[in-house]
Amino acid sequence: MQKTTTLFFSFSFIFILLSACTFSRIGLHMMPAVSDYKLFPKDTIFAAASPSASFVEAQNPNILPPLAHWLPKDYRKGEENWAQFMKKSHSTAFLVLRNDSLLFEDYANGHEKYEPQVVFSISKAITALLVGIAIGEGKISAEQPVSDFIPEFSDPERRGIKIFHLLNMVSGIDFKDERDFGKLSVLYYNNDQDKYIRNFDAVEHRPGTHFAYKSLATQILSSCLETATGQSVGDYLSDKLWQPMGMECPALLTVDSREAGNQRAFGGFALCSRDLLRLGQLLLHKGNWQGQQLVPKDFIEQIINRQEDGRAYWGYRNCFWRNGDLEKGIFQDRDFFASGYLGQFIYVNPDRNLVVIRQGKKENFLWRYVFNRLARSLDGESTDLNDHCQNFSAQFEGIYAAEDGEEIQLIEQKDKKGNSFWIWKGPKEKKQKLKQFDGLCIGKRSLKTKKRLIFNKLGNNIQGFHLDNQDQVDLKYYQKKSSISLKGRKALMAEF
């Protein structure tokens, strides 16, 4: 009842804030879809006048390791073949580039090879690459304040926000995608986004101190980019990447309205799969395309390398996600990816010379872990995370505290077969059982939700964990406070 009441008042408040046009858009379209480019006004970035040659075909194309070798058991439904897997996973495209050869390409669920599809937050990564190019050209600096480009940001609350903060989601602006559904809806369906971002002056944290994934940050970033370059995001993309790379398909970029003409740089690009693969290949070669350095090499290396300066979230840099398994001491690959709503992915593994593209109409499991398994399987290596987690589970036990002071207790138990499971107890929660997930995370299924505890490991010691209950990487962090005493352990067990 409490949740229903909260949602009612939240939506009521949203409706009061929205203009009639924005309200009607939300009412008409509701949740975003991969075909949204058909619904909204859009600008076209034309295909290259001279498209680059098709990818080199691998010697044994369209052959991947059996699903059982790299797809976790939780994700498999019996002995599925590939066609069944594509259908059940709601995938529309799956492409694998290895050693610069097209190893695998498949389309499903009504999607055609050259058909565009909205890539949502991969748009953020594309926008960031353009900012990297502008930095290399001296048109903008990562250390430059946003107020140099948007005068409204000169107010006391926002004047400390810099380009770097927007690139790395540490701006401190009071906007968080998974928390503020109302604000995100207003941003997505607003008919004048430039006006919206200029007037959005709520700040909750000092810039550079807190990571929070927010689409608003990239839209602000795109406004700065356009002022710095004197071009729209779409025109700059055409000049700097689309034409030089010989892209096969037009790129589409939705705009808020024909009157305002603001391009949705945070999530409005619609691209064909093969051009996504070319972007992945560009990233694989650190911004170099057939001998021409299109994106500064150091901008890409900032994503790949784990050289932190204390300001960026460990799993996110320059609008790309980093696998994070390296930080947890599990795998040593320096892989990274761009991702978008409904499971759009550009996955890049420089150590294995691999790019994977996945597009779909639904994200029903954690692809970011699947891609690394596929990469290892292609190289004939074990994909069982338990092989890389020796003596890992015993360190889970302890008392953990979040930044807001909330504490939880976690203890390990064994079932009759000797398999580990854990007992979780929070301040407002009944004691719950959690089962291990692939040796890396533990979680519990409750109806259609799953809590995931993704551990942060330094050397042989557990430092804490991130709590993720939405299958996305925006996580509440709990730091290990102390071990659990024998007395505390008995008290917790007595609640059973």
Predicted feature residues:
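N-terminal leader/targeting segments and the immediately adjacent pre-domain N-terminus
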Residues: 3-7, 16-111, 137-139, 382-384, ...
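Peripheral terminal and inter-domain segments
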Residues: 20-25, 383-496
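Structured C-terminal helix/loop/strand segments within mature extracytoplasmic catalytic/sensor domains
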Residues: 22-28, 338-390
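Short active-site loop at a secondary-structure junction
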Residues: 85-95, 106-139, 143-152, 157-159, ...
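Active-site helix/loop module of the DD-peptidase/beta-lactamase fold
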Residues: 118, 136-174, 202, 227-266, ...
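Active-site SXXK
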Residues: 100, 117-142, 166, 221-225, ...
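Active-site-proximal alpha-helical segments within enzyme catalytic domains
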Residues: 217-224, 265-289, 344-361
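Active-site Gly/Thr loop motif
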Residues: 248-254, 304-355, 432, 437
